[in-house]
Amino acid sequence: MKQILIAVLLSFPLIVSAEDEEQKDSLKVIHLDEVNVYSYKETMLQQMPVSSTTLTPNTINGAQLNSIRDLSVFVPNLFIPDYGSAMSTVPYIRGVGSRSSGQSMALYVDNVPYFEKSTFDFDFYDIRQIEILRGPQGTLYGRNALGGIVNIYTLSPFDFQGTKFSVTGGNYGLAKVQASYYDKINAHLGWSVSGYYNHVDGFFTNLYNHKKADNKTSAGGRAKIEWLVTPNFRTQYIFNYDYVDQRAYPYGLYDPSTGTTALPNYNDDNSYGRSMVNNSLLLEYTTDKIQLTSSTSHQYFSDDMKMDQDFSPKSYFSLNQRQKQQALNEEIAIRSKTTSNYQWSFGLTTFLQYLDTDAPVAFKKDGITDILQPVFDRAAAMGAPIMTITDTVMNIPGNFNTTTWGGALFHQSTYNHLLVDGLSVTAGLRADFEKTKLDYSTHSKLNLNMKMGPRTIPLSIADTLQGKESLQFSEILPKVALKYAWDDRQFAYVTVSKGYKTGGFNIQMFSDLMQTQLMNSGNPAATKINVADAIAYQPEHSMNYEIGYQSAFFNHRLKTHLSLFYMDISDMQLTKFVPSGNGRMITNAGEVTSKGMEVSLQTNLGKGFGLDVNYGYAHAVFENYTDSVKVGNTVEEVDYKGNFVPYAPQNTLCLNGTYTHLFNNAFIDHITANVQYMGTGKIYWDEANSLSQQFYHTVNAKVGLVKNNFELEIWGKNLLNTNYNTFYFESFGNRFFQKGKPLQCGVTLKVEL
C-alpha cells in the first residue's frame, strides 16, 4: 500500500499535466532558479569540474529545508542523521564521517568557518543560497573538508527591501515565529535585522518520569550592514546569535529477541543548552582585473550537556560537559577577474581557537555496587584483603583546555582552451600547518573499609592525572582537474584531489583512564598509563579520483550531473566505546575505500511543473582494520576487512516534484505544491556489520496558497509515518537506538510587505 501511495504522489505532476495540455505556460521560470556567485573563492559552480548542488530560496522553502539536518538525502550521498541533540550533528558524505572526531565536512556561513560540529545545528531563516561541494576541497578550504563543504549565504538588504513575518503551528506542540526587516537607505548602504523563535514539545516520552524526552526551544537573531563605499570597494558586517535549550538523547533499549526498540527509560537528566555568537567583517576590493577579499570572523559559543550515560533507570554514571569556545579566523584571498584564458587565485589563512571543557563524570550508587565493588571482590577471592566501598557517589572532575593554531597558503590556477578550444586544466596546491596543545587535570578519591581479621580499617585511595600534551600536523594538499567542454551546454571532467581531517585529543577517554589508575593505586606491578598514547589520534587522509559530466539542454530546462568517484582513505577516524563502557575512544581504522556514483537531474517540465532526481551510491568498506574486542573476560582480535563502514548509508535517493499554477481574476493569485520522496539505506550500525537499518523511505509535502502579500502553507513530514532508526550505540552490553521522528503536520502563515 505504501509503494502504491508513493507512486501516486510522484506521478501527480505528470497526471495533471496530461489533463491540462492546453493550459498556457504562464511561468517562464518556476523551477530552475537563477544561481548567483557569493563565494570569493569560487566562480560559477555549474562551470567547475566538481560535484556540486546549489539550492535557491524557492527550493529551500518548498522542500522544507529548515536546518542543516534537512539537507540529508536531499543532496546525493549526503547523510546527516537527526539524533541526540543539537550538539550531535554528524555529516556523512560519500561514506565518510565520524561521530566524535573533527568533522569530515566543513561548514561556512557567509564565508565564516564553523570550527565545531557542536555549532552546526541551527535554524535556517532568510537564506538566499546553499552550496554543497562533494569530494575533498582541501586546496581552497583546507582542514576538515575531506568529504566536502557546505556554504550557506543569508539574504542581503540589496536583494530585498521590506518586512517578512511568518508564524507556524503544528502537532507535537510546534510553535514557530520568524520576523525580519530589510532596508536600503540609499544606493550604497543597506541594513537588516531578523529573528526567530521555535519550540516543539517533543516526540518521545521518558517512561521513567513520563515527561517528553526531546522537547526543544531555540531562538536567535541576525543584524547585517552592507556598505558600497566606492564602486570598487564594499564592506559587510554581520552579527548573529543562536540559542538552544532542549531535553536530549531519547535513546531506547533494543531487544534483539523481538527486534523492537523501547521508549526511553532513564532516571538522570539528559539535556543540552547552547548560546552562540558570530561576528564577521568582509572587505572586498574589485577592479576589472582582480578581486581582493579579507574575511575576519570571531565565533563564541558556550554549551552545557548533561547525559545519563547508562540510559537506564539505574544510577550507574552520568556526565555533565560544559564547553566554552573562542575562535578567530582571518583569510585574505586574491583572484583574477579578467576574461583571459588564464585564471588564478592566491590565499593566506590563519586561525586561533581556544576551547575550555569542564567534563565531570559521576559514578553513582549502582555503578559503584555493580562495577567498582566487584573489582575488589575478585581481588579478595584471590587472597587480597576484603575491601568495601563506602562512597555512594564517586566524582571524577575533569578540566581540559585546548588551544589550536593553524595557518595555510594556497594557490589555484586554471588555463582555459589549452591546445584546443574547450579543454582546460586546473591545478592547485595548499600548504597547511596546525598545532594543538592540551592542558588536562582530573582526579578522584575513593573511600573504603578494609577488613583484616576482626579489624575494620577505614582508608582512602586517591589519584591525579595532570599534565600537558601537544600535537602538530603539516600537510600538502594538491588538486588537478582536466575539463573538456563541447560547448556552453555540456562538459566532462576528471579530478584528482587530496583531503585531510586533522587529528587531536579525545578527552572522553579520561574517565576510563582515571578509573584504571585508581584501581591500580598501590599496585607496583601495574602497567603505567601512557596518557599521550591513550588520548591522541592521528589525521585522516584521502585521495579522491572523480570523473563527471554536466549538461544543460532545452534552454536550461533540463540539467544533468553525473559522476563516478573512488576515495582511498587512510587512518580513518572511528569512535568506539572502551571495554569498560564508561568512555569513548577514537581509533585510526587502517584503510578504507569508498567508491560510488551520483546522479542529479533537474527538469522544468513546463505547465508549471518541475522534477528533481538526486541519487547517490557509496560503497565504503574496510580494506585493512583489526581491533581488540572484549568477549567475556578475554580480549580477541577481530578482522573487519571487507565490512562496510558503519553509520553511512549505501544509497540515498530524493525525488522532488514541484508545481505552480497562476490564476487570473481569482480569489488567490497562485498555488504551489511540493512533494519529496526520500529513500535511505542500507546502514550498518557497527564494524562487525551485525546490525543494520534496511532501506527505508519517507514522504514530505507542502501546499501553498498565495494572495497578494499573504501565503498560507499546509505541510507535512514523514507522511507515511515510517518507522526507522537514526542512531545506534552500545553501553554496558546493552544496545540502544534512537527512532526517527513520526508524522508531523502543520500550517504556516507568511506575510511579506
Language model region names:
Residues 335, 339, 345, 351, ...:
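Gram-negative outer-membrane beta-barrel transporters
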Residues 110-136:
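Short acidic/polar hinge/loop motifs at secondary-structure boundaries
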Residues 19-61:
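Short, acidic, small-residue-rich periplasmic hinge/interaction motif at the N-terminus
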Residues 282-307, 491-497, 508, 514-588, ...:
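Membrane-embedded beta-barrel scaffold of Gram-negative outer-membrane proteins
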Residues 68-71, 90-95, 108, 132, ...:
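N-terminal periplasmic accessory domains that precede
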Residues 345, 500, 608-611, 666, ...:
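C-terminal beta-signal and adjacent terminal beta-strands/loops
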Residues 69-110:
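Extracytoplasmic beta-strand/coil segments of soluble accessory domains associated
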Residues 162-164, 169-200, 204, 208-246, ...:
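Transmembrane beta-barrel wall of Gram-negative outer-membrane proteins
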